[in-house]
Amino acid sequence: MIVDTFTNRGSTFFSKLSTVLFFLCAVITFQGVIQRREVELDTPVYVHYAKYRSARFYHAFRNVRQQYAQVKFNMDADLSELWDWNTKHVVVYLVASYSTEKHEKNQVVVWDKILSSPEESKMFMKDTLSNIQAHPFNEYSNQFEGKNATYTLHWTVSPKMGFLSWGAGPGSYEIPFHKIITQPK
Amino acid sequence: MQKLSFRQGLAQILNLLLVLSSAYMGYKTLSFVTDCESPVVVVLSESMEPSFQRGDLLFLDNRNPSFDEAKVPSVFEKIIYGSPVGIGDIVVYSLPDRPIPIVHRVVKLYESENQTHLITKGDNNKIDDVAMFPKSINYLDRENHILGVVRGYFPYLGMITIWLTDYPILKYIMLGGLGLLTLIQKEEQ
């Protein structure tokens, strides 16, 4: 015999509610994968130069003096198409890619930004310097001479709920590293 | 009230154990499928704000297949098959002298045929993580230090875990409540 009481009604209601919420979360999570938003960029990054010199940062590699590089670039990229109702943030970062004898793939973030709205995702920057404090650009072998790097804009889309997604634009031309000659003191 | 028979009590306890062991088996299955000892972790600090807040649940994947370099895997393929750690991925790693794993973003990646080294940084931190490493470690190693790569996340649910840790009394209240519910609950005839 089924007793129709407030307790039973409440139990049935919350049971149904949790089931519906579960499926709603599942639908939101998987629609983000099936209905993924793409952006096609046409040469978003132009690099003026990449220069390096010997320096020392208190927080980088235990304050040991070594070679650090800095990049000057223009950026013209519209990532507002990545945004939909489930998008929370878009994190963009400029990645230097190059090969060495020891590692076929070296990738270093030299600049990044967190975009919090579609308007903010329309980026136009001129003569911007890479952030050498947050991303000290040193080399594994501590030798930049003779190396060339391409620079690519990457992004990560953080949803309000569900799976993260990634993307990248086309790379720039190969840019050699130049040494800065400083006058002896 | 109907007298609770011994057999009925045993049946109720068995039912509760079945629920708990099902949850545990589900967790272990997810652990096996993702090749990750902790496929679900809770964010405990603010170093990855604004993307992740304290109390968010993160779902990890530690599979490391070798992909054709020319082909960039789609998000769907990354989720179904896994993928190697890439620049900008958010990884969970542990250090030898730190009990709690750290969730940060890969900002430097050095890959060779048999070894992958990387350096991480929290989005909300001003500098990278090298200063946090013990003296003997200059780079994180993919095989030895990385527990998994973040694939997805769910907001707020992890707060339950944090509350249970911060307020131990809640543990006993919850366990006691479960026990009482098990014994009191009537079976419909």
Swiss-Prot record, chain A:
Q: How does it sit in the membrane?
A: Single-pass type II membrane protein
Question: What GO terms describe the biological role, i.e. biological process, of this protein?
Answer: protein targeting to ER; signal peptide processing
Question: What does the similarity note say?
Answer: Belongs to the SPCS3 family.
- Indicate yes or no for the key word Metal-binding: no
Q: Look up the record and report any one GO term of the cellular component aspect.
A: signal peptidase complex
Lineage of source species: Eukaryota, Fungi, Dikarya, Ascomycota, Taphrinomycotina
| Keywords, comma-separated and alphabetical | Endoplasmic reticulum, Glycoprotein, Membrane, Signal-anchor, Transmembrane, Transmembrane helix
Q: What is this protein called?
A: Signal peptidase complex subunit 3
Give the organism, scientific name. Answer: Schizosaccharomyces pombe (strain 972 / ATCC 24843) (Fission yeast)
InterPro entries to which the protein is assigned, alphabetical: SPC3 (IPR007653)
Q: Does the keyword Transmembrane helix apply?
A: yes
Coiled-coil-forming residues are: none
Q: Which residues are glycosylated?
A: N148
Q: Where are the transmembrane segments?
A: 13-34
- Function recorded in the entry: Essential component of the signal peptidase complex (SPC) which catalyzes the cleavage of N-terminal signal sequences from nascent proteins as they are translocated into the lumen of the endoplasmic reticulum. Essential for the SPC catalytic activity, possibly by stabilizing and positioning the active center of the complex close to the lumenal surface. Essential for viability.
Q: Which domain of life is it from?
A: Eukaryota
The record places the following residue ranges in the Lumenal compartment, namely 35-185
| Ranges in the topological domain labelled Cytoplasmic | 1-12
Q: How does it assemble?
A: Component of the signal peptidase complex (SPC) composed of a catalytic subunit sec11 and three accessory subunits spc1, spc2 and spc3. The complex induces a local thinning of the ER membrane which is used to measure the length of the signal peptide (SP) h-region of protein substrates. This ensures the selectivity of the complex towards h-regions shorter than 18-20 amino acids. SPC associates with the translocon complex.
> Where found?
Endoplasmic reticulum membrane
UniProtKB/Swiss-Prot annotation, chain B:
The EC category is hydrolase
* Residue ranges, Cytoplasmic side: 1-8
Tell me where in or outside the cell this protein is found.
Endoplasmic reticulum membrane
List GO BP terms, alphabetically.
signal peptide processing
Give the protein's biological function: Catalytic component of the signal peptidase complex (SPC) which catalyzes the cleavage of N-terminal signal sequences from nascent proteins as they are translocated into the lumen of the endoplasmic reticulum. Specifically cleaves N-terminal signal peptides that contain a hydrophobic alpha-helix (h-region) shorter than 18-20 amino acids.
Report quaternary structure and partners: Component of the signal peptidase complex (SPC) composed of a catalytic subunit sec11 and three accessory subunits spc1, spc2 and spc3. The complex induces a local thinning of the ER membrane which is used to measure the length of the signal peptide (SP) h-region of protein substrates. This ensures the selectivity of the complex towards h-regions shorter than 18-20 amino acids. SPC associates with the translocon complex.
Q: What is this protein called?
A: Signal peptidase complex catalytic subunit sec11
For this protein's source organism, the top of the classification is: Eukaryota, Fungi, Dikarya, Ascomycota, Taphrinomycotina
Chain's gene name? sec11
